[in-house]
Amino acid sequence: MRCKVQLYLCGKVFDEIVEARDYQDAKRTALARNPTAKVIGVTAVFG
């Protein structure tokens, strides 16, 4: 499924769209792309 992961880094909040199996996988993928960021939230994206 496609997930939107909200990340926080250096005072900014930004979204990372990832293809993942579940929410934990989405978090891992987003953190692999942005290792120093903090995950704020994960939501499924449809459409």
Residue positions per predicted region:
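Short, mixed-charge low-complexity intrinsically disordered segments
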Residues: 32-47
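Short aromatic-glycine-(Arg/Gly/Cys) micro-motifs in beta-strand/loop hairpins
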Residues: 1-14
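Generic detection of short hydrophobic beta-strand segments and adjacent strand-loop junctions
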Residues: 16-18
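Compositionally biased, intrinsically disordered low-complexity segments
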Residues: 8, 21, 42-45
